[in-house]
Swiss-Prot record:
Keywords: Periplasm, Signal. It comes from the Bacteria. This is UPF0312 protein PSPA7_0523. One of its GO terms (cellular component) is periplasmic space. Belongs to the UPF0312 family. Type 1 subfamily.
Length: 191
């Protein structure tokens, strides 16, 4: 009897573990403040100016054993740009930068994921300011597992660098401020 019980427990554990590693779809948990899309740009070459987008939605497919099957899709409300300075945010929403009246959303949709040791390169099409260009996000799995509410989560961080002029942003901020760095932290809830 004990052998059968131990065998059943071992089989159940193996199936449970295998189930955790299989491909799954995740919804980005922005409601619990477990996801952030932030950016930084040099200010005159002396310091960093940080900002974020407060309103976005997204999902991803994660298959730890087959990263090439992974997918990411995110939509950002560009009007939600926030640098903690109302006048600057108003200027960022204008035609000089994001032109939110004409381009109320920015989107990213992956086209390829390549594993690179303990990280991955997520390449996809970013549409920002009405311009679509390929962008590669350097991403890393931070962790995954069961949450206290009966769900399963996976968390990642990532970064990418964008040239403002590539996305039709012609405002000249000086030689030190031609690029903006995206800083991403995402926690997804398995669906």
């Amino acid at each position: 009897m004990l052998k059968k019980t131990l065998a059943a427990l071992a089989l159940g554990s193996a199936l449970f573990t295998a189930g955790q590693a299989m491909a799954a779809d995740y919804k980005i948990d922005k409601e619990g403040q477990h996801a952030f899309i932030e950016f930084r740009i040099k200010h005159l070459g002396y310091s960093w100016l940080y900002g974020r987008f407060n309103d976005f939605d997204g999902s991803f497919t994660f298959d730890e054993k087959n990263p090439s099957a992974d997918k990411v899709k995110v939509t950002i409300n560009t009007n939600s740009v926030d640098t903690n300075h109302a006048e600057r945010d108003k200027h960022l929403r204008s035609g000089d930068f994001l032109n939110v009246g004409k381009n109320p959303t920015a989107t990213f949709e992956s086209t390829e994921v390549k594993a690179n040791g303990d990280s991955a390169d997520i390449t996809g099409n970013l549409t920002l300011n009405g311009v679509t260009k390929p962008v590669t996000i350097k991403a890393k799995l931070l962790g995954q597992g069961n949450d206290p509410w009966g769900g399963y989560r996976a968390g990642f961080e990532g970064s990418a660098t964008l040239k403002l002029k590539d996305f039709g942003i012609k405002m000249d901020l000086g030689p030190a401020s031609q690029e903006v760095e995206l800083l991403l932290s995402v926690e997804g809830i398995r669906q």
